[in-house]
Amino acid sequence: VIGGVECNINEHGFLALLYSRRFQCGGTLINEEWVLTAAHCDMRNMYIYLGVHNVSVQYDDEQRRYPKKKYFCLSSRNYNQWDKDIMLIRLNRPVRNSAHIAPLSLPSNPPSVGSVCRVMGWGTITSPQETLPDVPHCANINILDYEVCRAAYPELPVTRRTLCAGILEGGKDSCNGDSGGPLICNGQFQGIAYWGADTCAQPREPGLYTKVFDYTDWIQSIISGNTDATCPQ
């Protein structure tokens, strides 16, 4: 996260670290057995840490898990094509809630343009050169009109299952390593970080976030055992 500050140790109990030999992505614990992240964060030999604040300090209640099963939203038969950048991971066993671990519930209504949102992660705090912090950083950004992102990135599809969020004048943004992590607006989990410009936090080049609200039915169906649930078109 660019332009942020160290997150309060008590505000990110749902934030997961996804590793495969090294730190790759963030994720969000949505109940004791499930983590939501971005599809492009999928990797082999993944393991997931919860309850971490400083990566160089071991916490008593830190818990490590593996994916038992991964669910994707594939919109076509081309399995290499992530049209919808969302992945739901069932953990190999549930985590216990503790001082530093608590899930974040799914949103009950969609966010509105202008909402103030908190983005968080262990991604780089400088750009384009990368500096990975030991602690997660948090910043407040705004939901912007989707047309701001379409103007910045003309190749974007017209689809609205994506949130455009940032600061118009630049200076605060998610960045490399924050992918898969949450965007929280008015206390609700509204977005999953997935894409932005090569240099982060530039004016008029906001970040893109998968719109969690549009996928809540799909997520809840899978969690309740209907693993053939279809994604929103």
Curated annotation (Swiss-Prot):
Residues bearing carbohydrate: 54
Main subcellular location: secreted
SMART domains (UniProt xref): Tryp_SPc
GO cellular component: extracellular region; secretory granule
Residues annotated as the enzyme's active site: 40 (charge relay system), 85 (charge relay system), 179 (charge relay system)
Keyword Hydrolase listed: yes
InterPro entries for the chain: Peptidase_S1_PA, Peptidase_S1_PA_chymotrypsin, Peptidase_S1A, Trypsin_dom, TRYPSIN_HIS, TRYPSIN_SER
Alphabetical UniProt keywords: Disulfide bond, Glycoprotein, Hemostasis impairing toxin, Hydrolase, Protease, Secreted, Serine protease, Toxin
Cysteine disulfide partners in this protein: 7-138, 25-41, 73-231, 117-185, 149-164, 175-200
Enzyme Commission numbers on file: 3.4.21.-
Domain named Peptidase S1: residues: 1-224
Oligomer and partners: Monomer.
Protein name, entry field: Snake venom serine protease ussurase
Organism: Gloydius ussuriensis
